[in-house]
Amino acid sequence: MSEHSSHTAAKLSGDFDPEQKRYLEGFMTGVQIGRAARGAPGSAAAPGSAALLPGAAEPTGPDAAHLRAQDRFLQDGKKLSDPEKFKRELHPFDAYQKLKEQAVNNEAPKAADNFRWRFYGLFYCAPNQTAYMCRLRIPNGILKHWQLAGVGDLADRYAGGYAHVTTRANLQMREVEPKNAVALLEAIQDLGLCSRGSGADNIRNVTGTPTAGIDPQELIDTRPYAREWHFHILNDRSLYGLPRKFNVGFDGGGIIPVLEDTNDIGFQAVAIRDGFDVEPGVWFRLLLGGITGHKDFARDTGIVVKPEQATTVADAIVRVFIAHGDRTDRAKARLKYVLDAWGSEKFLDEVEKKLGYKLPRAPVEAIASRPVFNRAAHVG
């Protein structure tokens, strides 16, 4: 039992009979073991520095898979990267009150909180600007006219009076003083928009065909699939705090592409021809491991996914990444590096174990040729 728990039990010793004392001592030991399992401050296993206590309880709750992944590196004698330590010490979604206190004091965040607040879409931009940038989430890049007008009003009220369009069909506002950060976040939600998980080690804004629903050549309208994935992420805390950022894009097979092969997961609409083992019709071809700006394009896995199963398959892929992505080296923590280390087949085997069924494969000759399209025919 730790010094703290022994002291606590001793302090109470005059108030309880021997049986109650034994119970309290056991209880306090259990508390310490539980804190060690979570890497909590004041526990015997400090975050990022030591393995779990022998016999410590398994982590539970929505963050359990992330804690187990971190524990595996610690038990191998490795050190977690600083962002992993920050997440382990205090989960960003448990720190909203701290963000509010900083806003009241117009206080700039220190390094750990600067990382944590990115889970809310806030990036402190020092030394270039002594202010935050706030990035939204706009699935498939589509918002209502009154929401766009509302963002303009918020930029005038809480930011620098302007917003930038991002490469993921998104909007972000700059020059947000710390005192205005919380007011801006809550006003964004009043508009029916959000910024949750738009930065740091999270699944970023989902992209879809820019002309979805009006492209005369599209095989499928990507909007409902991007929207489903968007709300799936928002409502599952276990999908936050990945080893590194994660991008998903849906391409509808039209004249205007979404550049899905620059994403960690690319769902590319294809038409399967008759005469093969796969049911003919429109499917998503599954691409994995792209990284924007690295000249690493997502690889065709040979797998095809029914559109209505896209969210389920993407969820399984993300959970395998959560369990096996690198938590020690930020430069090697993207999905691509798991694929490089394992190979696609081993990775897909793990995904299929998560799903509980095999994913269909379609040979290249089963896929109908795509009509002419222009990969540069987009803005951003």
In which residue ranges do the predicted regions lie?
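Extended, prion-like low-complexity intrinsically disordered regions
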Residues: 2, 42-48, 52-56
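Structural motif
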Residues: 13-20, 307-309
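Aromatic- and Gly/Pro-enriched helix-to-coil junctions and flexible linker segments
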Residues: 22-31, 35
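Short runs of predominantly hydrophobic/aromatic residues within well-ordered alpha helices
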Residues: 20-21, 314
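Peripheral terminal and linker regions in Fe-S/redox and tRNA-modifying enzymes
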Residues: 52-380
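Intrinsically disordered, low-complexity regulatory segments in eukaryotic proteins
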Residues: 2-17
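Short, tandemly repeated low-complexity microdomains enriched for cysteine and small residues
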Residues: 36-41
